[in-house]
Amino acid sequence: MPYTGDYRIEAIGAAGGYDTQSNGGIYRGRGARMKGTFRLSEGETIHILVGQEGGINTVQSAAGGGGGTFVVRGSSTPLIVAGGGGGVDYSNSRYTGCDASAGTAGRTGHMSLAGGSGGQGAQTAQNRNLGES
């Protein structure tokens, strides 16, 4: 940081992917928007990892979720984290369950697959939604 002071930081998670066979690009899950003010010292370093858009699918199947965005003090102390939005499959309207939230647990999503917390997402395939059969 060039000066000691209070810095306002805003992070936005990436949008989820979509299916090109529909209007999914309009209705894909949106990333969370998080912001806060942090006291940082002159010479201190922060690192920023920007989440990438979720994978786009061309065969009318589920697409990948968006990546989270992370701002870290030094090499390992998180300041702010914004989760990415969920990917959608053949959507013709918005499903708010696919949008990221400010909470620490994952959301259920549109097809009722379990939202995860602490690395515990869906455990079994359901109607091809996990890329398994």
Where are these regions (language model features)?
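Extended extracellular/luminal ectodomain segments enriched in beta-structured repeat modules
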Residues: 1-8, 41-45
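C-terminal reverse transcriptase regions that engage the nucleic-acid substrate
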Residues: 15
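Short, surface-exposed beta-strand/strand-loop-strand elements in extracellular ectodomains
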Residues: 18-32
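Secretome/extracellular-domain signature
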Residues: 28-133
